[in-house]
């Protein structure tokens, strides 16, 4: 078998990739202690994930944390993940389950809401009551991803190259004239 000097060892990234661009990801080198060994080191995998909570649904699609709270979209349910290694399904409603990632945004303490984008639909979760709305009608089929800026929710529609803007600190109010669209390719 051909010898590859320096093939097994850790990262040695330099500022310039021309100098050295070795990078080891999720593995660590363990030097061989014996001087008689033909190998200088061995690569071993880094310790992986630890199970934090178990839920009935599969396909973790989004995870969002704010103000000592954590929410997750798993399959068609929205879960509130607790710091006691437990999770509970938000009391009512489901979201569209598709193979794509979901997205979650918050309008902070002023609005107390989470906007969840899942399967081209948008859903509003009122944090104080753990109430999940049905799909927001104005955004039905128009929500690829969600975001927030300065208290305004944003809904991105990749099919139409548009983004929609909610009312200030109110994810339930969407004016159909409040959108922007790219008009020409760069």
Predicted regions and their residues:
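Beta-hairpin (beta-strand-turn-beta-strand) motif
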Residues: 117-121, 127, 158
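Asp-box/WD-like beta-propeller blade repeats and closely related beta-sheet repeat scaffolds
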Residues: 127-151
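Short secondary-structure capping/junction motifs at helix and strand boundaries
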Residues: 123-136, 163-165, 172-176
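Short coil/turn segments at the loop-to-beta-strand junctions that recur within blades
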Residues: 93-99, 138-143
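Elongated alpha-helical scaffolds
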Residues: 98-122
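General structural concept
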Residues: 58-62, 66-67, 96-106
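N-terminal beta-propeller domains
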Residues: 1-87, 142-186
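Local beta-strand/beta-hairpin segments that build beta-sheet-rich folds
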Residues: 88-93, 133-137
């Amino acid at each position: 078998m051909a010898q590859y000097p320096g093939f097994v060892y850790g990262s040695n990234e330099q500022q310039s990739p021309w100098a050295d661009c070795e990078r080891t990801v999720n593995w660590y080198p363990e030097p061989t202690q014996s001087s008689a060994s033909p190998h200088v080191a061995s690569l071993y995998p880094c310790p992986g994930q630890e199970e934090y909570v178990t839920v009935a649904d599969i396909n973790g699609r989004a995870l969002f944390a704010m103000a000592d709270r954590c929410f997750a979209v798993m399959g068609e349910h929205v879960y509130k993940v607790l710091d006691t290694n437990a999770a509970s399904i938000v009391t009512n409603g489901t979201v569209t389950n598709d193979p794509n990632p979901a997205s979650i945004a918050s309008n902070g303490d002023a609005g107390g809401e989470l906007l969840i984008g899942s399967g081209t639909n948008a859903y509003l979760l009122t944090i104080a009551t753990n109430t999940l709305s049905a799909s927001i009608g104005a955004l039905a089929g128009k929500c690829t991803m969600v975001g927030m800026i300065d208290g305004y929710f944003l809904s991105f529609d990749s099919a139409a190259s548009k983004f929609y803007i909610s009312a200030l600190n109110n994810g339930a109010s969407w004016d159909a004239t409040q959108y922007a669209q790219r008009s020409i390719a760069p």
